[in-house]
Amino acid sequence: MKIVLCENIDWLLSKEAFSIYASCMYHPSYEEYKAQIEDYLHDSSVKVFVCENHGKKTGMMVLKLTEATAEIIGIAVSDNTRRKGIGKQLIQRVMETEHLERIKAQTDEDSIGFYRKCGFSEERIVKEYPDGSVVRYNCVLYK
């Protein structure tokens, strides 16, 4: 298994990439995914890393980098390869290769367990929206 910076724009805009990344999107649609990726491609502070296993991409992580800190915009692993440590390896390897001092993320109840397993500390916050409140977590992992 290898984790690499993905610069293949055709793949990033593909339905294969969307099928992996959709699990970390709110109400995912392929059109919305493509629009987000196109925005990221125009932002030099955003990088996309993928996990490749025997030539097949099984996970991806989108990061916004600022000096020695990164914020996870999204991280996802293909359905059939979940719970095998791919997400954790994405975080660890990117932290090493990009020489990061810390990685931040914001998540919900569904994913907080993943971040805990990866060693992130967390702060529980409640966000108020017109249609109700939502519990979110600000997570941080230090080198």
Regions found by a protein language model. Name each.
Residues 1-35, 50-52:
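Short amphipathic alpha-helix that is part of the acyltransferase structural core
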Residues 39-45:
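Short loop/turn motifs at secondary-structure junctions and domain boundaries
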Residues 50, 56-64, 69-76:
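Conserved beta-strand in the GNAT
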Residues 77, 83-96:
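Conserved acetyl-CoA-binding loop-helix of GNAT-fold acetyltransferases
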Residues 96-110:
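Conserved GNAT acetyl-CoA-binding A-motif
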Residues 104-106, 121-139:
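Conserved catalytic-core motifs of GNAT/GCN5-like acyltransferases
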Residues 115, 120:
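Conserved active-site tyrosine of GNAT-family acetyltransferases
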